[in-house]
Each structure stands twice: as structure tokens, then as C-alpha cells.
Amino acid sequence: MSISISDSAAQRVSAFLNNRGKGLGLRLGVRTSGCSGMAYILEFVDEMNDDDIVFEDKGVKVIIDGKSMVYLDGTELDFVKEGLNEGFKFNNPNVSSECGCGESFNV
């Protein structure tokens, strides 16, 4: 089981946590949503849950709940700039299809 984070994503998450002034790391998860079935969740973590799995890469803790791990194993979290847009990108080897709008995926 593994989760990794790119240099650009690590820098962005670290900056967000520093600006926020608190937080243990970043929670990465999935929820049922959209036309393809699942969507990613990204949120700051202030307290750990009993079923959390912690991965640390490039000085950033990425926390995943046990139920989401099966869908996220092997995922790399990246931060990209494309033209005027910038944001987090999920390089997930488990994805079999994505919806046309890019909001959800299926495994």
C-alpha cells in the first residue's frame, strides 16, 4: 500500500498548513458522487480517527481512512498549473473511467 505526493503538491500543502497555523496533514478520501460514481475528498486533518492510515512523503502527512484505501492505493497527489488554472491532480492507477466533466471517476 502506498500514497505519494509530488514536490509541487508537497510545497503547496505545506504552505496551506503554515498559513492555517495548525493541522496534522491532509486527508485524501473518496465519496459517492457524480455520474461516474466516486469523487475525491481533500481536507485538512486536526484529529486522527481510529481507522486512519498515515503516509508521509516529502515532509507531508497524507491521511487516508481505511475504507478509501482500496480505491486510492498507488495514487500520487500532484499540484499542476495549466494556463490560468491551478489545482491538485490525482494520478490514480485504479481509475478505469472518468466522467466527461472530470468531477468523478470509476474503479
UniProtKB/Swiss-Prot annotation:
| Alphabetical GO biological process terms | iron-sulfur cluster assembly
Instruction: Give binding positions for Fe cation.
Output: 35, 99, 101
Query: What is a GO molecular function of this protein?
Result: 2 iron, 2 sulfur cluster binding
For the keyword Metal-binding, the answer is yes
Keywords of this entry: Iron, Metal-binding
Q: Name one Pfam family in it.
A: Fe-S_biosyn
GO annotation, cellular component aspect: cytosol
PROSITE patterns to which the protein is assigned, alphabetical? HESB
Name the SUPFAM superfamilies on file.
Answer: HesB-like domain
Entry cofactors:
Fe cation
Superkingdom classification of source = Bacteria
Tell me the cofactor note: Binds 2 iron ions per dimer. The dimer may bind additional iron ions.
Tell me the subunit arrangement: Homodimer; may form tetramers and higher multimers.
Functional note: Is able to transfer iron-sulfur clusters to apo-ferredoxin. Multiple cycles of [2Fe2S] cluster formation and transfer are observed, suggesting that IscA acts catalytically. Recruits intracellular free iron so as to provide iron for the assembly of transient iron-sulfur cluster in IscU in the presence of IscS, L-cysteine and the thioredoxin reductase system TrxA/TrxB.
Family according to the record: Belongs to the HesB/IscA family.
Question: What HAMAP family would the database entry show?
Answer: Fe_S_insert_IscA (MF_01429)
Identification of the protein by name: Iron-binding protein IscA
Q: Which organism is it from?
A: Yersinia enterocolitica serotype O:8 / biotype 1B (strain NCTC 13174 / 8081)
Q: Which gene encodes it?
A: iscA
